[in-house]
Regions:
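Short secondary-structure boundary segments
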Residues: 144-145, 166
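Conserved active-site segments centered on acidic
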Residues: 2-137, 146-153, 157-160, 248-250
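Phosphate-binding/catalytic loops
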Residues: 2-34, 38-40, 47, 53, ...
């Protein structure tokens, strides 16, 4: 492929990564779901909103899935409803995002039923996952192992703060609130450092809890039945509780 001056990659995407996305015709198939995956929208440059606001110094959580129209925005708006009052910024992105698409209607409806703000759900627009988002995030929560792998490949230094949402819940189940708070206290007063320290404390449980990799993924409901959306939400929702508990332990003194 010959790249013209108009083919410059958008902000936050390396030329190598942009070339890979332009050459790619279909996204990887999720191991958790045999349904058709969303088709990537690589030919058009991603909007400027793909770059995080680096001037925003709030503790930051990033959620990641494939198309950024079902699972990761549902996790985003549910976490935002609970954690924004604590000064936490929550946003989401997709490894093969359907850029500028809204959340699917069932995802919006279920998210609101579970406590998300209606405006936040309807206002979502899908974005590509790019390196600056991962660098800026204090905690990265993916919806499946394939997204965790993709994120760590883009930003290897994010390994110890990147989990699937269900993996985080499984690991956090063996970490007491007091232990999470103690880890945060050891990091000092900066909220972002405190959240990263709590995430590291969860990481350290990886050798202490039974591995259950097949249960670490959340099924992709895209183009599937309402029942599949509800199953996906039922796999996602318990992890929201665990994230909230750990974040509160880290930030509330």
């Amino acid at each position: 492929m010959i790249f013209r001056s108009s083919d410059r990659p958008p902000e936050g995407i390396s030329r190598r990564e942009w070339r890979r996305r332009n050459l790619q015709t279909t996204p990887p198939v999720s191991t958790a779901d045999a349904a058709p995956a969303p088709v990537p929208v690589a030919p058009e440059p991603a909007p400027q909103s793909t770059a995080p606001d680096l001037d925003d110094n709030r503790p930051t959580i990033l959620t990641v899935c494939t198309g950024n129209i079902c699972r990761s925005p549902m996790a985003e708006v549910l976490l935002r409803a609970r954690l924004e009052p604590l000064g936490v910024r929550v946003h989401s992105a997709g490894t093969h995002a359907l850029v500028d698409h809204t959340m699917t209607e069932p995802a919006q409806e279920i998210a609101v039923e579970l406590g998300a703000g209606a405006d936040a759900a309807s206002g979502h627009r899908a974005r590509y996952l790019v390196e600056p988002m991962l660098k800026d995030a204090d905690l990265v929560l993916t919806m499946a192992r394939e997204h965790r792998s993709h994120s760590v490949q883009l930003m290897p230094s994010a390994l110890k703060r990147t989990f699937t949402l269900r993996e985080f819940a499984r690991l956090a189940s063996t970490l007491s609130t007091e232990s999470a708070r103690a880890a945060a206290d050891a990091a000092g007063d900066d909220p972002r450092e405190r959240l990263r320290a709590a995430a590291l404390a969860v990481t350290e449980q990886r050798g202490l809890t039974p591995a259950a990799p097949d249960e670490d993924d959340i099924i992709d409901p895209y183009r599937r039945s309402r029942e599949t959306y509800e199953l996906s939400a039922s796999q996602l929702a318990p992890g929201i509780d665990d994230v909230e508990r750990v974040v509160r332990a880290a930030l509330i003194r």
